[in-house]
Design a protein with these regions (language model features):
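Non-catalytic, topology-defining segments of multipass membrane proteins
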Residues: 1-232, 237, 279-334
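Pore-loop/selectivity-filter region of tetrameric P-loop cation channels
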Residues: 76, 162, 261-274
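Helix-loop boundary elements of multi-pass alpha-helical membrane proteins
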Residues: 91, 240-245
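Membrane-interface module
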Residues: 112-116, 256-258, 265, 275
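Substrate-binding/catalytic groove segments of enzymes
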Residues: 242, 269-280
Length: 334
């Protein structure tokens, strides 16, 4: 196991254009991790081919699409609201039962257990687009070849590396939370449940094994793949393509990418998020669709959420600028 967090000097000397120090010295992960990650990535594409073949000439069952949409929304909001805005950044305070429900829903998205996910994301904010960032598209520099390699690394390649993020440093609060630790330990079972439920519901609704299998394909494997690639696109595309209306820290190239706003539940307003990481709303400008923020607002009105960090108009106005903020402080929540 390798923890590749660079010395302070390397981070301070980074010029924002060159490859990260040690970028080519990334040992591969162990065989078991590579195998599991490859299976999670490849199997949904096989499922897509099988599902298209099975539906050829007769179309996709409406129940399969409805189940896929329901599971996509539930698990997606579990990641965006639970893993990200609540547990990583503390954008609001949730009732204990809601914390657990959101953590369970996020775990069913097949993106890693809650402790690892939060630790990696806090590390990403601490070292955004500079040495130490676990999935920056600028890892191999800003030239064309380096940028293409970096996009592949940020989107998916980093999952195959042996670059561990220490939970004890980046998520000690969750490590000490017994409920979150239990949810993390249950991650394999929750992944199994995420695929079993569509199968069982498809069987119950259609009354046939064929209906169960097609529901498993569309609402199980294919739904998982879509959510994963949308999340990974925020890591990769939302640091390269799009607009940067707000000031961020030095070297931070996070962008707003509107085509992904709905599918990502507002996560693709990434520049707004990196400008104000603890804000419960990522779409900081008028007209920016942010379903996750809308759901948090509903939780607040129901009394399930409190201490919500909503945008401060005066502060947002001050953050609007063309130049990045020169700030090298190492704050894991930013």
């Amino acid at each position: 196991v390798t923890i590749s967090e660079p010395p302070v000097k390397d981070r301070q000397d980074y010029d924002g254009r060159s490859p990260f120090p040690g970028a080519e010295q990334h040992p591969p992960a162990n065989g078991v991790q590579v195998g599991l990650t490859a299976a999670i990535v490849v199997l949904p594409f096989i499922a897509l081919v099988v599902a298209i073949f099975a539906s050829w000439g007769q179309g996709i069952a409406l129940t399969d699409l409805l189940l896929a949409a329901i599971f996509y929304v539930v698990t997606g909001l579990g990641v965006t609201i639970g893993f990200h805005r609540l547990l990583t950044h503390g954008s609001f305070t949730a009732r204990p039962w809601l914390r657990v429900v959101l953590a369970v829903a996020g775990s069913m998205g097949f993106q890693g257990n809650v402790l690892d996910w939060v630790a990696v994301h806090r590390r990403h904010h601490a070292f955004t687009d500079r040495p130490g960032d676990p999935h920056s598209p600028y890892r191999y520099g800003t030239g064309l070849r380096g940028q293409l390699r970096g996009l592949a690394h940020a989107h998916l390649g980093w999952l195959f590396s042996d670059d561990r993020t220490p939970i004890t440093r980046y998520a000690p609060d969750l490590l000490a939370d017994r409920a979150m630790s239990r949810v993390a330990r249950a991650f394999p079972a929750l992944c199994a449940l995420s695929l079993t439920l569509p199968f069982l519901l498809g069987w119950a609704i259609s009354g046939t094994l064929y209906g169960a299998l097609t529901a498993f394909l569309w609402a199980g494997l294919i739904r998982v793949a879509l959510l994963q690639h949308v999340t990974w696109s925020v890591n990769s595309l939302c640091h390269v393509i799009g607009s940067r209306p707000f000031r961020t820290r030095r070297h931070d190239r996070s962008t707003n990418l509107w085509p992904l706003a709905l599918l990502s539940f507002g996560e693709s307003w990434h520049n707004g998020h990196h400008s104000e990481p603890t804000c419960a709303r990522h779409g900081l400008q008028r007209g920016q669709l942010d379903p996750s923020a809308a759901m948090i607002r509903l939780f607040e009105r129901l009394g399930w959420a409190s201490d919500v960090h909503w945008p401060d108009p005066a502060r947002i106005l001050r953050r609007r600028a063309r130049a990045p903020v020169i700030d090298s402080s190492d704050d894991r929540y930013r």
